[in-house]
């Protein structure tokens, strides 16, 4: 059977991908690629540079393969390469950084991995950046990996989205496989556990379900907060937990909140979850965020100027996913436009307004007064002392950023100041922050404290 002409095939692939993918994704990554040839059941796709090749390999090769299969009626192998003369080109022109010339997606997975268990090859201890925000969680995870079923059982990792809970859990799994290749390591989300349970009930195979999970040497359960309201799932998990714990097997659980804050969680489960160690993970501080970016750039074989690292770390503070996403966005932007890796070139693509949060004026006033070692009364006064006036201007700026209050209402919160005073203060700080990196860092730190202050006040 003759294969379809390559131009015709690629034209159809583009038509379907244009519908399936978002416009920015299609324009940036798919439209710039081209199909070179189709032979021996292998489609060769050419990309303009190594970064584009790696990006397609990492995120879109499966999508492309599925579309090609739907057109040809049979599966084909997809091989993505770089146009001749581009393989070793430094993108950016300034020689300030390099892109990897090796394909990062071809990491060899652990050959001892159970077929029902999926661990990310990048989630290992050596790639985890330790800081004040996660030191205890890291130490506890390493201790569990070295001696499972002993001191911290269960280990309950608690923290917000994108802070490294899943990384630590899977690092435990990888470590155990290195030490004991025949270990039965089960990593499962709470949703998957529930789905497996439903399937077992439907197929009348509850015994197999129980034997499967209770055979684990290490059970890693992610997002346990989603067990909320699932009474039968809680019942089965309780007995699975008991069986493993009594047998000296290790259980590691991750959640975005402590056990006692998971609604409708059975009291006996809450008690079991709390009987080991609850290790909290907070948002990383500036130094840790910079270290994370540095380590990621080293693994990707990219040289980043220190001021770029500091700029990204200062402006993206919520979690690690946001931080790494900003770096990825920066690399894509620089690659596409062929620009040097500088703060000035990255500023347009990394613009991120400060997060609007449900902060009360009182919470903001409290943080500002505490930071500048003055009183709230000083902030509301008519004092023109330099330190008080400066603190007041920053407070007005942050209140504008973190609330929906109008300029007149903000003026009222600061002791009845005129709205023109508030407008002047906000404009002044906004202009200064564009060139004053120290001020930008101060504002981010104050914003982080305001967020924590506001969350702690929620019922």
UniProtKB/Swiss-Prot annotation:
Pfam families: Bac_DnaA (PF00308), Bac_DnaA_C (PF08299), DnaA_N (PF11638)
InterPro entries assigned: AAA+_ATPase (IPR003593), Chromosome_initiator_DnaA (IPR001957), Chromosome_initiator_DnaA-like (IPR020591), Chromosome_initiator_DnaA_CS (IPR018312), DnaA_C (IPR013159), DnaA_dom (IPR013317), DnaA_N_dom (IPR024633), DnaA_N_sf (IPR038454)
Biological process terms in GO annotation: DNA replication initiation; regulation of DNA replication
SMART domains in alphabetical order: AAA, Bac_DnaA_C
Keywords, sorted A to Z: ATP-binding, Cytoplasm, DNA replication, DNA-binding, Lipid-binding, Nucleotide-binding
Domain IV, binds dsDNA as annotated region, ranges: 335-459
Subcellular location: Cytoplasm
GO cellular component, one term: cytoplasm
Description of how the protein assembles with itself and partners: Oligomerizes as a right-handed, spiral filament on DNA at oriC.
Function: Plays an essential role in the initiation and regulation of chromosomal replication. ATP-DnaA binds to the origin of replication (oriC) to initiate formation of the DNA replication initiation complex once per cell cycle. Binds the DnaA box (a 9 base pair repeat at the origin) and separates the double-stranded (ds)DNA. Forms a right-handed helical filament on oriC DNA; dsDNA binds to the exterior of the filament while single-stranded (ss)DNA is stabiized in the filament's interior.
Family: Belongs to the DnaA family.
Protein name: Chromosomal replication initiator protein DnaA
Lineage, broadest ranks: Bacteria, Bacillati, Cyanobacteriota, Cyanophyceae, Nostocales
